[in-house]
């Protein structure tokens, strides 16, 4: 398996400020996070992802931490 192959996708916002707020909340909690802009039929959306992680297990553990902080997400391969 490739290294850094997994991320946790948290949300996609049409409001990029909301995406930035979530990213900052994650970063403040010690979770590495980043945003990506997606072009969709409904216009641009800003996706918030945490990671990358080297294994699905590491990503799942990080997701457990996010859930404890009141956030939710899904583990996906990059």
Indicate residue ranges for each PLM-predicted region:
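Extracytoplasmic
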Residues: 14-78
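Compositionally biased, proline/threonine/alanine/serine-rich low-complexity intrinsically disordered stretches
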Residues: 1-7, 11, 17-18
């Amino acid at each position: 398996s490739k290294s850094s192959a997994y991320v946790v996708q948290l949300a996609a916002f049409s409001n990029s400020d909301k995406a930035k707020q979530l990213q900052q909340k994650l970063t403040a909690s010690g979770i590495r996070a980043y945003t990506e802009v997606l072009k969709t039929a409904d216009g641009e959306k800003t996706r918030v992802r945490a990671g990358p992680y080297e294994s699905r297990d590491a990503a799942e553990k990080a997701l457990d931490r996010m859930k404890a902080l009141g956030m939710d997400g899904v583990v996906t391969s990059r």
